[in-house]
Regions:
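Alpha-helical segment of the N-proximal tetratricopeptide repeat
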Residues: 27-63, 67-77
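Bacterial signal peptide processing site
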Residues: 22-26
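Structural signature of tandem alpha-helical TPR/SEL1-like repeats
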Residues: 40-53, 75-87, 94-97, 108-121, ...
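Structural marker of alpha-solenoid helical repeat scaffolds
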Residues: 57, 91, 125, 159, ...
Length: 235
């Protein structure tokens, strides 16, 4: 069984908003800016308090809702984060970053179909959204929808042709479909870009064996063992 590599753990796109405006205590942007400053210092709880103050003054302030959602997301308060992201989308439906982050929470909660729905809408709004294409590919592969995974990984490689992990995962998808020549080609590209990823060596060994190329498979397995001893799983 070949191995997928997930190279960002459902990346949280912060994209914190700092609104321009007045500086008085009755100005929601004042509290929003204070929250952003506290957030940048790692004072997430204090930042949440400031964003809530901004929203008490202006309940439909999109920037404060988004920043509050991100703060909740960082703290792992996913239910609260979902509510805030949904509020942002009510105010601004065509926000691909919010859709991406919402999908990330759904994926963490094993709600893969909901995650895919959010990410598909994100890439519809922003076709060159590489991170969203990658997680779509990864999630489709997990669901064994390899044609869809291949499509998404190729879109990533259009923007990031030297991404070793995406080449690896595309190779895995081709292997699962029995397209061994294409799989070997992608895995070799991955190895050329980053020779030290042990899992890619293991995947290449697997593809070679399925192809009947035992000598090449044995060589990759030896390299795989050497790399795992050094701790190079997905570097």
């Amino acid at each position: 069984m070949p191995f997928l590599i997930q190279y960002f753990s459902l990346l949280l796109l912060s994209g914190i908003f700092i609104a321009a405006g007045g500086c008085g205590v009755h100005d929601p942007d004042y509290y929003n800016r204070r929250g952003v400053s506290m957030d940048s210092q790692g004072r997430i709880d204090d930042a949440i308090g400031e964003y809530k103050k901004a929203l008490r003054l202006e309940p439909y302030n999109r920037e404060s809702h988004y920043n509050l959602a991100v703060a909740y997301h960082k703290k792992g308060l996913y239910k609260e984060a979902i509510e805030e992201y949904k509020t942002v989308l009510e105010l601004y439906p065509d926000d691909p970053e919010t859709l991406y982050n919402l999908g990330a929470i759904y994926a963490r909660s094993n709600m893969q179909d909901a995650a895919i729905f959010a990410w598909e809408k994100a890439v519809e709004l922003k076709p060159d959204f590489t991170e969203a294409h990658y997680v779509l590919g990864f999630t489709y592969a997990q669901k064994k929808q390899f044609d869809e995974a291949i499509k998404e990984y190729n879109k990533v490689l259009e923007k990031k042709p030297d991404d070793a992990i995406t080449h690896n995962n595309l190779g895995v998808a081709y292997t699962e479909k029995g397209l061994l020549d294409a799989a070997i080609d992608e895995l070799r590209k991955s190895v050329k870009i980053n020779p030290s990823m042990a899992m890619t060596r293991k995947n290449l060994e697997f593809a070679y064996r399925k192809k009947g190329m035992e000598e090449e498979a044995d060589n990759e397995f030896k390299i795989y063992e050497e790399l795992t001893k050094k701790g190079n799983q997905a570097q």
